[in-house]
């Protein structure tokens, strides 16, 4: 396993299904996470953000009230958000490519299909911690860079202003 101190990681788990929430919490505890905060829905999670200041959020897509998708959009764009850069791992049973795109376009860092496995949770958690994506601000989007592939063969002009890309450290804080 990696050298990450999971005991120092503060994780917010948001799911309106108590059984799924407990499963994710149990998996995180098995990794050594001790600072786990649970929220029963998007509104509850939003109310906790100022006091909790999580390093990572694991969030269900389909919840009553504020959905996971609505939560991520609000997290990334609302002027009252305490940390728009916090990494978000979206959990869902909807794995069609359109759902993956919607989560990505809302600002989710990673996508995790239900039912979750220990290996899949670890993989996504390591992805957001060890390989954080730079954040991009565009006219209609703010969130982690959506590019997954880097091409050494691209010869055209860089279309992004480097001043608009923000690097994060291993716990999602601005560098």
Residue ranges with predicted function:
Residues 63:
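Receiver (REC) domain active-site loop signature in two-component systems and cognate sites
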Residues 18-37:
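Two-component/phosphorelay signaling modules centered on CheY-like receiver
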Residues 38-47, 68:
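Helix N-cap/capping motif at the beta->alpha junctions
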Residues 116-129, 133, 137-138:
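C-terminal output helix
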Residues 130-175:
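CheY-like receiver
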Residues 25, 70, 84, 95-110, ...:
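Alpha4 helix (beta4-alpha4-beta5 surface) of REC/receiver domains from two-component response regulators
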């Amino acid at each position: 396993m990696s050298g990450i101190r999971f005991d120092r990681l503060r994780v917010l788990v948001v799911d309106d299904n108590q059984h799924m929430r407990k499963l994710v919490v149990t998996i995180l505890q098995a990794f050594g996470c001790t600072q786990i905060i649970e929220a029963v829905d998007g509104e509850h999670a939003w109310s906790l953000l100022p006091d909790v200041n999580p390093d990572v959020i694991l969030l269900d897509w389909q919840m009553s009230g504020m959905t996971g998708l609505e939560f991520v959009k609000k997290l990334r764009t609302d002027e009252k958000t305490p940390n728009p850069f916090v990494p978000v791992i979206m959990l869902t049973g909807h794995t069609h490519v359109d759902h993956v795109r919607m989560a990505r376009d809302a600002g989710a860092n990673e996508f995790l299909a239900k039912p979750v496995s220990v290996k899949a949770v670890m993989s996504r958690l390591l992805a957001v911690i060890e390989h954080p994506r730079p954040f991009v601000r565009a006219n209609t989007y703010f969130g982690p860079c959506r590019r997954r592939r880097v091409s050494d063969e691209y010869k055209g002009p860089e279309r992004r202003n480097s001043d608009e890309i923000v690097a994060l450290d291993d716990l999602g804080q601005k560098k």
